[in-house]
Structure formats: structure tokens, C-alpha cells
Amino acid sequence: MIGCLIGEVFALEAPTVLLNVNGVGYEIDTPLSTFCQLQKGQKVTLWTHLVVREDAQQLYGFSDAQEKTIFRTLLKVNGVGPKMALGILSTLNVELLVHTIEHDDVNTLVKVPGVGKKTAERLMIELRDRFKTLAQGTSSAAALPQIQFVSNSPVAEAEAALQSLGYKPLEAQKAVAAVKADYTESADIIRAALKSMMK
């Protein structure tokens, strides 16, 4: 099992990070809360979870051990796979997710792409007790550092990131169009678009 990887960020394409670890490039899918903290050339430690399926192996990476623990906890819920768990962590930061579960806020959870009412209710029931211990000491991911994107425009990067979370192309375009005039960086556009879609 690969518990964490320490290396240099070689490339970024939301939500995937290519991490150079001693000459070996690892493709790691990350929640946007982690992705938005990374810059090309930066040396980082990513806490990882490896998912092995019959047809593929996929690494998921997180900026801290707590986010990894929550990802693994989400995977234990019936009907929640890695893509949905990543979408939940990308849409709601750790603090907001714990608050949402504690307060039975189904309406917030159903705004996550792919999470319907039944899944949201199941998440509430199965995670309530597990998240009580996480309620203390969670930190908000609201103030994330800027990110440098290599290839596309900030608008295109933001739209691609939202689509990778499961939003339809038209939804992503509308959300980005509504906020793009106020921001120049992709990470800021992504955060603002997600916030507007959660209203």
C-alpha cells in the first residue's frame, strides 16, 4: 500500500496531478481543496489512497491525513465510490462537510454532483457518529493559495475542473461565466463558481 508520496509537481490538469518521485511520474487524482494548493515545480507530500479494480489502479491524493481519512470514511458508505467521494470533498471542504453531516443538512449534500436525496440521507445516517470526533479541529479550506495553470486559460481550466466533479458542461459554463469577470486566477474562479452553485 502506498500511504504517501513525496515529490515535485510536474504537471497539473484538474483534478489530476503528475508527481515526480525520484524520476517516476505518478498520476494522482485530488479533490480541488488539495489541487488548488499545488504549483508546478513545488515539492509536496500527498497522503495517498490506492484503489485497485479489475481493470485499473488509481491513486487519490490529499494535502493532509485528515482529508484522506474522511475520503476513506466516505468510501465505506454504501453507494459511494471514489469519484463521488472526491466530488464531495471538492465541493464541500472538510469543515463544511462535517457541519453538514452534524446538522442533517440534506439540502447542501444534494447540491454535490451525483448525490441524490437517498444517497444524502444514507450519508447522514452512516456518517453522523463517525464525524462527531472530527467536529473539533477541522480547518477551513477557504483561504487557499493561488495556483499556476500551465496550458489553458483560467476560464477553460475552471470549466474543466467543474466538469471533472460531475457537473454538466452547460452547468459548468454558466457557473464560470457568472463569476469570471471578478477573478483572474483559475483557483479563484473555481471556488466562486462552486460557492454560487451551492446557493
Swiss-Prot record:
Subcellular location: Cytoplasm
UniProt entry tagged with the keyword DNA-binding: yes
Chain segments carrying region Domain III: 150-199
Gene Ontology CC, one term: Holliday junction resolvase complex
Gene Ontology biological process terms in this record: DNA recombination; DNA repair
Chain intervals for the UniProt region annotation (Domain II): 64-142
Domain of life according to the entry: Bacteria
Keyword DNA damage applies: yes
GO molecular function: ATP binding; four-way junction DNA binding; four-way junction helicase activity
Region described as Flexible linker: spans on this chain: 143-150
Residues passing through the membrane, by range: none
Record function comment: The RuvA-RuvB-RuvC complex processes Holliday junction (HJ) DNA during genetic recombination and DNA repair, while the RuvA-RuvB complex plays an important role in the rescue of blocked DNA replication forks via replication fork reversal (RFR). RuvA specifically binds to HJ cruciform DNA, conferring on it an open structure. The RuvB hexamer acts as an ATP-dependent pump, pulling dsDNA into and through the RuvAB complex. HJ branch migration allows RuvC to scan DNA until it finds its consensus sequence, where it cleaves and resolves the cruciform DNA.
Subunit record text: Homotetramer. Forms an RuvA(8)-RuvB(12)-Holliday junction (HJ) complex. HJ DNA is sandwiched between 2 RuvA tetramers; dsDNA enters through RuvA and exits via RuvB. An RuvB hexamer assembles on each DNA strand where it exits the tetramer. Each RuvB hexamer is contacted by two RuvA subunits (via domain III) on 2 adjacent RuvB subunits; this complex drives branch migration. In the full resolvosome a probable DNA-RuvA(4)-RuvB(12)-RuvC(2) complex forms which resolves the HJ.
Domain notes: Has three domains with a flexible linker between the domains II and III and assumes an 'L' shape. Domain III is highly mobile and contacts RuvB.
Membership in a protein family: Belongs to the RuvA family.
Protein name, entry field: Holliday junction branch migration complex subunit RuvA
Organism: Acinetobacter baumannii (strain ACICU)
Gene this chain is encoded by: ruvA
